Amino acid sequence: MDEKKLFLKALKKKFEGEDPDEKYTNFYCFGGWEQSARKKEFTEYAKKAAEKRGGIPFYNPDIGVPLGQRKLMAYRVSGTDAYVEGDDLHFVNNAAIQQMVDDIKRTVIVGMDTAHAVLEKRLGVEVTPETINEYMEAINHALPGGAVVQEHMVEVHPGLVEDCYAKIFTGDDNLADELDKRILIDINKEFPEEQAEQLKSYIGNRTYQVNRVPTIVVRTCDGGTVSRWSAMQIGMSFISAYKLCAGEAAIADFSYAAKHADVIEMGTIMPARRARGPNEPGGVAFGTFADIVQTSRVSDDPANVSLEVIAGAAALYDQVWLGSYMSGGVGFTQYATAAYTDDILDDFVYYGMEYVDDKYGICGTKPTMDVVRDISTEVTLYSLEQYEEYPTLLEDHFGGSQRAAVAAAAAGCSTAFATGNSNAGINGWYLSQILHKEAHSRLGFYGYDLQDQCGASNSLSIRSDEGLIHELRGPNYPNYAMNVGHQPEYAGIAQAPHAARGDAFCTNPLIKVAFADKDLAFDFTSPRKSIAAGALREFMPEGERDLIIPAGK
């Protein structure tokens, strides 16, 4: 047994008393569902709730397939020392996952230069750092629900919307020095020097505000509400800060800029059959999500950066988007957690990165098909060998689609590390799926590999429904809308080449800067750590309603 394997510690803990490489095991001797402290808690609550609601049947673990035929495994959240029950990684049971999704949905970036040009050129009003600071005070009053223009306007209780605020950033160091530090996202402080210079060169002298609409708003409404909520308060705040007349024609320009022209949303609108507005998970492109995650600011390890992106994306795309928005089921959690528990994907990715570093060097070779074939084959065969050598590893990833996703993710990321190219990376993924199917005759459930069979040819297509650079693809890309166990890993492959190159951002420098924000409840520098805290019930979310409900409820 090779003790260097990253996943062995977790396997020994999960299957205590069984060697990871043991070929034989036992069944029906572990206590059934009662071996799980969480399921016992569920049962106790369910009995009380059933009585409370007049005997209407409720949760009963004795219904259906017998639970606990084997060990009901704990899961180690990869990159942490936290062992948690699988139930606590379901997004409904995990406040951190909920907050991560909310923090994305409630964010909108709005350019300020159009509004400033209207003020100066149409209205003859001077815009200075002092007036910008005054405006930012006004928007931080109005955005949470404070009135600024009219009397007799109802307002929102600040205690319900403490998480709501607006911040500002710019690529102009001179302007940044003059802005109120309380509301400034300081690129020079938040990013390593080389990354900061790269970001500022892209942003230039332009100025942007980042608005965080209250969590409770996106819980009650949806992501499509966010730009409207933001725009209304922007208009009111400009009127207040610059002493404008609410009815004059120039106000229409503010409205157009705040609602449309200068708006950067986190996700695009969905087609009618999926019926979701902008800023919903299904519209978040893979490169956009890679920029939302902030690990690249604090780590120069390409594998770690990519793994953190995959973990957060697993919760967003597989658990919440496909698992609930699109499917409505509870079973998608296990597909997602395969990518961020028990250090299994970590082991495969670090093996691949070491192979690449030794043979090619990080970003040390051109993206050719020979390189894709070599790296993807090596990493895929290594991954499959681990499942064959360690039966407990096979039991941990009990589904073929879990194994296919994890092996292919490692192959794709490793190929991207070598080439600094996401197209090569995604072709590494596609080759891995084909190799895996050749080895095992199948991957996962029927149709799991539909998108993988046509993927390589589409990666080089220019047809609008087939070809798109990988970073700009997302859950809404036609062939990617089908199956679980793909989208999170695609996000990691979008991140991997940029992490290898040391890029400051993946797709959009504005989104990268907007989430370099220490005041967000979810820690985007370390999604796995936050998710673990949520599973351990140690994460404090935003948007709670205690102030307006009866005490003791």
UniProtKB/Swiss-Prot annotation:
Sequence positions that bind coenzyme F430: 150
Key words, A-Z: Metal-binding, Methanogenesis, Methylation, Nickel, Transferase
Cofactor(s) of this protein: coenzyme F430
Catalytic reaction(s) noted: coenzyme B + methyl-coenzyme M = methane + coenzyme M-coenzyme B heterodisulfide
Its EC number(s): 2.8.4.1
Positions of post-translational 2-methylglutamine modification: 402
Any one GO biological process: methanogenesis
Residue numbers bearing the 5-methylarginine modification: 274
PTM-bearing positions, type Pros-methylhistidine: 260
Ligand binding (coenzyme M): 335, 446
GO molecular function: coenzyme-B sulfoethylthiotransferase activity; metal ion binding
Keyword Transferase carried by entry: yes
UniProt key word Transcription regulation: no
Pathway named in the protein's UniProt entry: One-carbon metabolism; methyl-coenzyme M reduction; methane from methyl-coenzyme M: step 1/1
Modification after translation: The alpha subunit contains six modified amino acids near the active site region. Is methylated on His-260, Arg-274, Gln-402 and Cys-454, probably by the action of specific S-adenosylmethionine-dependent methyltransferases. Also contains a thioglycine at position 447, forming a thiopeptide bond. Contains a didehydroaspartate residue at position 452. The methylation on C5 of Arg-274 is a post-translational methylation not essential in vivo, but which plays a role for the stability and structural integrity of MCR.
Family according to the record: Belongs to the methyl-coenzyme M reductase alpha subunit family.
Family matches, as NCBIfam families: met_CoM_red_alp
Subunit comment: MCR is a hexamer of two alpha, two beta, and two gamma chains, forming a dimer of heterotrimers.
Protein name: Methyl-coenzyme M reductase II subunit alpha
